[in-house]
Each structure stands twice: as structure tokens, then as C-alpha cells.
Regions:
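Class I SAM-dependent transferase core
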Residues: 1-70, 75, 105-120
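Conserved SAM/SAH cofactor-binding pocket of Class I
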Residues: 60-142
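A generic alpha-to-beta junction signature in SAM-dependent methyltransferases
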Residues: 66, 159-163
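Conserved beta-strand segments of alpha/beta enzyme cores
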Residues: 96, 121-123, 168, 189-192
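A short SAM/SAH-binding and catalytic strip from SAM-dependent methyltransferases
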Residues: 139-152, 156-157
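Conserved beta-strand signature within the Rossmann-like core of class I S-adenosyl-L-methionine
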Residues: 163-176
């Protein structure tokens, strides 16, 4: 069985510039999620041993295209157990993340994992994203949460539009998305994750970006 350090090489072969603090945080994710997943199931039991490939690296595909400055405000819509926001918060320690989910026990896992590995830049909120009215964000992110039409309906009103900035929605999706994109009424940019990470798992997985 591979050690956590060996599994982490899957991440570091694509991202070589992590600080020692970030590497410690990434290494700690496996133990933290295994401990909490045994109490509150946020990652399928058969998937937990593939945490770094299926969840951490998948989440970090957003980091491969994002150039976020210090102070950028990001909302994770339907964050579940913390993907993509937890790996992204490690990658961007000076970016502020709001992790939103309608299921409180999932946010309990996010809070616990953040405390265990020392993530300071995620705030959780037990609510539905459509009920957030008085706060604006630079970006919304999500992974396998809802159809693109709904995601943009929720995200569009709370995204700041800035000149010469690609502010908007970035979501991770898989499979044949042509009908979903057609029904969304928006014109997103669609990128193959397999073009970024040459792992078989990503062959039919995509980054969908909608600019405000």
C-alpha cells in the first residue's frame, strides 16, 4: 500500500512550488478525512483511498487555470465535505473562501479538517446559496453540484464584475455536457482536465468557466 507521501507525489509532480507549510497541510488531509469520514460520510468509502487523485488533484485543476490575487473572495457552492474549497484554500492561503452547504453535518467535517491541518482562510455557512443576498464574491466554484443553468442562476447575482478580470463561475463537471450547456443559456469556456493532468481518471472531466 502506498504511503501518504507517495500519494502526495501525484500532486507535487504537477505543482512544484508548495511551501513546507502547504506540504504539511496536504499530507494531513488523508488522516483528517479518514477520521471524519468514519463518522460522517462525505467521501464514498471505496473512494477514500483515492483521496489525492479523485478529490485533491481534481479540485486543484481550478488552481491550474486561476490567477487569484491576495484578498480575492471565493464562494464554494454546495461544498459538501470540502471539495474543491479545502485543496484550493491550501493552494491560495491569501484568498478568502466561503464554503456553503445546506447540510450542516458536512460543514462540520470541513471545519474539523481545517482545524486539524491548519487552514485559516475558509469560513463555513449553513445556508442555501440562493439565500445569500448581501455579499459579493469575485469567483464561485463548485464540483458536481447542480446543472450549469442553476449554478449560474445562483452565482451570477453575487459575482462582482470587474474590468479586465475573468470574474465568474468555475465548476468541475464530467461526461457529455453538450445538452447541459445548451440548456444553460450561457456560453462557457470548456477545458479538458486531461489536458492538464495526464491521469486516466480525468479523461472525461472538464472545467467549465462562465465569466460575469
Amino acid at each position: 500500500m502506498e504511503s501518504t507521501e507517495q500519494k502526495l507525489e501525484l500532486i507535487t509532480k504537477y505543482f512544484a512550488d508548495f511551501t513546507s507549510t502547504q506540504l504539511v497541510q496536504l499530507t494531513g488531509l488523508e488522516a483528517a478525512y479518514k477520521e471524519w469520514n468514519s463518522q460522517i460520510n462525505v467521501v464514498s468509502r471505496k473512494d477514500i483511498d483515492q483521496l489525492y487523485l479523485h478529490h485533491v488533484l481534481h479540485s486543484l485543476s481550478i488552481a491550474a487555470i486561476a490567477e487569484w490575487e491576495k484578498g480575492t473572495q471565493v464562494i464554494d457552492i454546495g461544498c459538501g465535505g470540502g471539495f474543491p474549497c479545502v485543496p484550493m484554500a491550501i493552494f491560495f492561503p491569501e484568498v478568502q473562501f466561503l464554503a456553503v452547504d445546506s447540510i450542516a453535518k458536512k460543514l462540520k467535517v470541513v471545519d474539523a479538517v481545517c482545524e486539524m491541518v491548519g487552514i485559516k482562510n475558509i469560513t463555513t455557512k449553513h445556508t442555501r446559496v440562493e439565500d445569500i443576498k448581501n455579499k459579493k464574491f469575485d469567483y464561485a466554484i463548485s464540483r458536481a453540484v447542480a446543472p450549469l443553468k442553476d449554478l449560474w442562476k445562483w452565482a451570477g447575482p453575487i459575482i462582482n464584475k470587474k474590468p479586465n478580470q475573468p470574474n465568474g463561475l468555475i465548476c468541475l463537471k464530467g461526461g457529455d455536457l453538450h445538452q447541459e450547456i445548451f440548456e444553460s443559456g450561457v456560453r462557457p469556456k470548456m477545458m479538458s482536465i486531461y489536458d492538464i493532468f495526464q491521469e486516466e481518471y480525468f479523461k472525461e472531466k472538464f472545467i467549465i468557466q462562465v465569466k460575469k
